[in-house]
């Protein structure tokens, strides 16, 4: 397994996704969705180059889709994969990635 790190903002995103899903659907659905997101993170950590380039918005960023969410990654200077954010596809992605 390739090494990856998850930023504080991405952890907050994932936590908020779980809470929203549990409150609006069910804990079981929240757990399933959480696992889908983590599976995508692990896949990209192993296959970084398969993620789509997002450099037109943020230099060196890539993303991959996990259901209705986009998982944003970059490589660190130590060649680790950093999960930067996990955002819903209908959010204002550009502004969310700036903050």
Pin down the residues of each PLM region.
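Basic/aromatic recognition patch in beta-strand/loop cores that engages polyanionic ligands
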Residues: 49-78
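Solvent-exposed interaction patches of small proteins and small membrane subunits
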Residues: 32, 56-57, 94
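Arg/Lys-rich, positively charged N-terminal/basic patches that mediate binding to nucleic acids
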Residues: 1-34
């Amino acid at each position: 397994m390739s090494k990856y790190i998850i930023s504080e903002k991405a952890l907050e995103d994932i936590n908020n996704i779980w809470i929203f899903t549990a409150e609006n659907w069910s804990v079981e659905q929240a757990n399933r969705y959480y696992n889908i997101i983590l599976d995508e993170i692990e896949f990209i950590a192993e296959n970084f180059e398969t993620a789509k380039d997002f450099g037109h918005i943020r230099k060196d960023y890539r993303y991959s889709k996990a259901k209705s969410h986009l998982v944003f990654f970059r490589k660190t200077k130590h060649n680790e994969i950093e999960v930067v954010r996990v955002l819903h596809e209908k959010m204002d992605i550009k502004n969310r990635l700036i903050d």
